[in-house]
């Protein structure tokens, strides 16, 4: 999904049944996703991506793989998050499997730390679906469980 870089920038958030999703957009790319306790006063609630999130939470399959994200992270971590984007809807993988998908050695302590750090510091969870990895992630555990439940039904 290409966002209009001339007009699509800002903070957008919406409350869903069990949690709030906040997205930050700059230059037509998603630069941040968080799950605050409430919709911030300065956040707009109308955004096409939030509409897609609503449909997804209602059970409509959406891989979000067309959503352009800005990943300003080290190269090794970028490869991990790009591999995470390729984990199919409704599936989960181990940290070890994700390391292999990212071209890293899951037996190497440094490579394993790279994977775990990338997942914990993922700036755009949901669009880089760390909830599909059995291990650490930027998505809060309760939200991750809900997202996995949505994808398994």
Segments (PLM) and residue ranges:
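Basic nucleic-acid-binding alpha-helical/helix-turn surface characteristic of O6-alkylguanine DNA
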Residues: 1-105
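Nucleic acid-binding interface residues in structured DNA/RNA-binding domains
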Residues: 63-153
């Amino acid at each position: 999904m290409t966002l209009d870089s001339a007009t699509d920038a800002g903070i957008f958030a919406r409350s869903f049944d069990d949690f709030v999703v906040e997205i930050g957009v700059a230059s037509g790319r998603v630069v941040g996703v968080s799950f605050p306790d409430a919709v911030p006063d300065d956040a707009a609630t109308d955004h096409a991506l939030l509409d897609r999130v609503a449909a997804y939470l209602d059970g409509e399959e959406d891989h979000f793989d067309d959503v352009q994200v800005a990943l300003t992270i080290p190269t090794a971590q970028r490869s991990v998050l790009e591999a995470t984007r390729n984990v199919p809807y409704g599936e989960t993988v181990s940290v070890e499997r994700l390391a292999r998908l990212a071209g890293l050695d899951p037996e190497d302590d440094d490579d394993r730390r790279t994977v775990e750090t990338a997942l914990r510091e993922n700036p755009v969870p949901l669009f880089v679906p760390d909830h599909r990895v059995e291990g650490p992630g930027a998505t809060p555990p309760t939200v991750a469980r809900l997202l996995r439940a949505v994808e398994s039904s």
